[in-house]
Amino acid sequence: MLMGSIARRYARALFSLAVEQGRVEPWNDALQVLKNAVEGSPDLRDVLSNPVYSKEQRRAIVEKLASALKLEREPANLLFLLGDRNRLAYLAAVVDTFRSLADQHLGRLRARVTSAVPLDASAAQAIADRLSQATKATVLLDRAVDPALLGGVVAQVGSLVYDGSLRTQLEDLRKTLKQ
């Protein structure tokens, strides 16, 4: 609970600055890249959160990372700030909250679509289009693969779940046959 409220504070502050500067989408993209870079490198995460390294050393590393990733100053400053305050563990929550605020601001919804096999681009677009029609909003897909579904897809948009998986259909058939 505490992590969520702290992450929201950082995300809202950065988001309001992004809105003022008209940089919501670019910063959202930059924050996703930053999050992936830090999560993808345990060594980097350790260095940035290890008090053995001075703030100056950590800041120099963040500057090199920001330069390598071609980040704007403000998204990079988030990493400086979290590192300086020993709150690097909040980075993922801050970025996810910022993304939610950006999606809401831009009138988008995110749908988690799980399929038994990877979806090709045309199938993913068809699902996004159908979900957009159903929700009357622009829908962006976060795709996942779960072979246990056997076939079909499960789409979750907010609290709504559309389950068209073969696994569920077989379970429903089994229940019907037992009656």
Swiss-Prot record:
Task: Quote the Pfam families the UniProt record gives.
Answer: OSCP (PF00213)
The record lists the membrane-crossing segments as none
Record keyword Transport present: yes
Record's signal peptide: none
Q: Give me the Gene Ontology terms describing cellular component.
A: plasma membrane; proton-transporting ATP synthase complex
Q: Which UniProt keywords apply?
A: ATP synthesis, Cell inner membrane, Cell membrane, CF(1), Hydrogen ion transport, Ion transport, Membrane, Transport
Q: Which Gene3D superfamilies match?
A: N-terminal domain of the delta subunit of the F1F0-ATP synthase (1.10.520.20)
Q: How does the record classify its membrane topology? A: Peripheral membrane protein
Q: GO MF annotations for this entry?
A: proton-transporting ATP synthase activity, rotational mechanism
The record describes its quaternary structure and partners as:
F-type ATPases have 2 components, F(1) - the catalytic core - and F(0) - the membrane proton channel. F(1) has five subunits: alpha(3), beta(3), gamma(1), delta(1), epsilon(1). F(0) has three main subunits: a(1), b(2) and c(10-14). The alpha and beta chains form an alternating ring which encloses part of the gamma chain. F(1) is attached to F(0) by a central stalk formed by the gamma and epsilon chains, while a peripheral stalk is formed by the delta and b chains.
Q: What does this protein do?
A: F(1)F(0) ATP synthase produces ATP from ADP in the presence of a proton or sodium gradient. F-type ATPases consist of two structural domains, F(1) containing the extramembraneous catalytic core and F(0) containing the membrane proton channel, linked together by a central stalk and a peripheral stalk. During catalysis, ATP synthesis in the catalytic domain of F(1) is coupled via a rotary mechanism of the central stalk subunits to proton translocation. This protein is part of the stalk that links CF(0) to CF(1). It either transmits conformational changes from CF(0) to CF(1) or is implicated in proton conduction.
**Protein name, UniProt field:** ATP synthase subunit delta
